[in-house]
Regions:
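N-terminal Sec-pathway targeting helices
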Residues: 9-26
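Bacterial Sec-dependent signal peptides at the C-terminal "C-region" and cleavage site
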Residues: 26-47
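Non-catalytic, glycine-rich low-complexity segments
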Residues: 41-87, 94-97, 137-140, 522-526
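Aromatic- and carboxylate-lined catalytic core of secreted/periplasmic carbohydrate-active enzymes
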Residues: 42-46, 52, 72, 420-421, ...
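Extended acidic/polar, glycine-enriched regions
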Residues: 88, 92-155, 179
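Active-site clefts of carbohydrate-active enzymes
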Residues: 346, 389-391, 408-446
Length: 595
């Protein structure tokens, strides 16, 4: 009799189904039990980048971690170290940071502040395991500039730690510098600004925007302001792809797939789907490259933690927010060329208590105590009397900056705590909002240049911004200016600022004080009476100066072109002296120094 296919019995089918379900249940049980448990790696290898380095460079210890890796290396593993002078007189507690998505690489950096021998001990922790390493290195005096500090003798001003040179703060904004895909564009932007004697750039770490403020810029592959310090959540990414698939198949289901597809989109400021517990390593590595390039040119980078333009932030005071700040400190703190800025337009997304607490924490967490500030819209929210707050970062757009900065100096003196005064947002070239006070022409290169003179002649410092009209991802696509730092040869505003920098740094400006009462006709004067008189004449002409008797060298400077004209020795016997007329029209500066 021919054999046909056997028919499975119902009981056999039930047994097989039961076995499959049992295996599936066991797998789920194992996953549930062990999910989140951090097992130790099989081995950890430590390596040291340098045995000998200059003071204010940094040594880096790389930690290679084998599998099994921490489930989330940003929360489930850590690298910490103690660095000490060989004689044990000084110690620094330093945090390391994860530098790979899978947790296979950690790094810890240390910037030694002086020549000598140093030792260290580091510990990597993952789960219940601890792996340690120790070593030493030698530091030479390479005459490098260290971090900028407040001049202890002249507290309105800054000095470079290490060399003791004075730092003439001359800044610009380039908020989304690291939004460039091509690192060569970033390096070229820094180099160009450095050649224009810009020595400070405001760059955001986490700020994002979908507003372009009327400028001819747009997000595209080559540049975007939709920067991504964090990774997006895996589950949200899967939902997003599922939603996109439904859209492509033209499925509706009451708009469900449209809703799902929008559940995660890093380009969406309102719903980026960030997992605040995981950092996007490629973005932070790109930022490292920008900082290293700036470091080689003594360019200070003001690290603006976040911006009001971002529509989502980690919750104020949350573990996510503090993890972000501590990661930034661990990663970037060893660069000598940084300062901290708690946030742009800060008072619109954080209150004063947060500002005070967070500024204080940053000074506790940062082993190098880099200078720190904040940048609110309303200047009453600056924490000017607190120890953590090192200099002002005003936002004031009027075209009466000289009087404003003098008033701020007076207010600061009234607090019993002298710190440098800086206006870091008084306007951008070719960009002047309707709400700002100034009138037609207030956004021209010449108006901003003159405004910068008003600020520095009040003993203050300033940060300006170049035109963005040359376009980013919009033809001619050669600019970006204040938004991203890129520029071309048609952008010449900062050439005018160069002459101001040259004039101010030609004398010991930090030894002078505003003394407008010594000059007439609306002119401005910085003086150390009897030694230095630096005068700015907004409308050229002559100036009458109340001056102590003596012989002085005198030089006219064309504030617009940098042209210099030396006068014969000025011999003063009476308490007033009237200059000859300036050699030209427009604005001029006059410098008298005692022989």
């Amino acid at each position: 009799m021919p054999q046909g296919n056997k028919i499975a019995s119902p009981s056999g089918t039930r047994r097989r189904v039961f076995r499959v379900l049992l295996i599936f249940a066991l797998i789920l049980t194992v996953v549930f039990i062990f999910h989140g448990i951090t097992f130790p790696p099989s081995h950890v290898d430590f390596s040291q980048s340098k045995q000998v380095l200059d003071a204010y460079d940094f040594v880096e210890l790389e930690t290679r971690v084998s599998s099994p890796h921490a489930p989330n290396p940003f929360t489930d593993a850590s690298l910490k170290g103690v660095f000490s002078t060989a004689d044990g007189s000084k110690h620094w507690q330093v945090d390391g940071f994860c530098d790979s998505d899978d947790g296979s690489v950690f790094r810890i950096r240390f910037m030694p502040p002086a020549a000598g021998d140093y030792t260290y001990s580091v510990e990597y922790q993952q789960g219940w395991s601890h792996r340690t390493s120790s070593g030493s290195f030698h530091v030479t005096d390479g005459h490098r500039r260290g971090p900028i500090r407040i001049d202890a003798q002249n507290r309105w001003h800054f000095v470079w730690e290490g060399t003791g040179e004075h730092y003439f703060f001359n800044g610009t904004t380039a908020y989304w510098l690291v939004g460039w895909r091509d690192d060569n564009v970033i390096r070229a932007a820094i180099e160009r600004l450095h050649n224009l004697k810009i020595n400070r750039m405001r760059v955001t770490i986490a700020g994002r925007t979908d507003k372009f403020f009327g400028e001819p810029v747009m997000a595209a592959e080559s540049w975007t302001p939709h920067i991504r310090p964090w990774r997006t959540g895996k589950s949200l990414r899967l939902l997003h792809y599922f939603g996109r698939l439904g859209q492509k198949l033209h499925l509706s289901w009451g708009g469900l797939f449209d809703f799902i597809s929008n559940s995660e989109n890093p380009e969406d400021l309102y719903h980026p789907g960030f997992d605040y517990s995981r950092f996007d390593i490629s973005y932070w590595q790109k930022f490292d490259g920008a900082l290293a390039c700036a470091h080689d040119r003594d360019m200070i980078i003001s690290l603006v933690l976040d911006m009001n333009d971002s529509r989502t932030h980690p919750a104020a005071g949350s573990e996510d927010e503090r993890r972000f700040i501590r990661y930034a400190i661990a990663r970037f703190g060893a660069y000598s060329n940084i300062t901290w800025d708690l946030g742009d337009d800060l008072d619109h997304y954080r209150d004063d208590a947060w500002t005070h607490d967070t500024g204080t924490l940053i000074k506790q967490w940062d082993p190098y105590k880099h200078l720190a500030t904040s940048h609110p819209i309303d200047n009453i929210h600056q924490d000017r009397a607190s120890d953590w707050f090192d200099f002002t970062s005003f936002q004031e757009w009027s075209r009466n900056q000289h009087a404003f900065m003098l008033a701020q100096r007076k207010q600061q003196e009234g607090l019993g705590r002298i710190i440098p005064q800086a206006n870091e947002e008084y306007g951008y070239e070719d960009h002047y909002p309707a709400w700002a006070i100034g009138g037609a022409g207030s956004d021209s290169a010449d108006a901003l240049r003159r405004t910068a003179w008003e600020i520095v002649m009040a003993g203050g410092y300033q940060t300006s911004g170049e035109t963005a009209r040359r376009g980013t991802n919009i033809l001619p696509d050669t600019g970006g200016g204040w938004m991203n730092g890129r520029g071309d040869n048609t952008m010449t505003m900062f050439q005018g600022y160069v002459h101001m920098v040259d004039f101010m740094t030609s004398f010991d400006w930090w030894k002078t004080e505003p003394h407008d009462e010594l000059v007439n006709q609306g002119n401005y004067c910085l003086a150390k009476p009897g030694e230095i008189y630096a005068i700015y004449l907004p409308h050229a002409g002559k100036v009458t100066l109340q001056i102590l008797p003596g012989s002085y060298n005198a030089t006219w400077w064309n504030a617009n072109t940098g042209q210099k004209s030396t006068l014969s020795t000025v011999n003063v016997a009476s308490p007033t002296w009237t200059s000859p007329g300036a050699p030209g029209v427009n604005d001029w500066a006059l410098l008298l120094r005692k022989k």
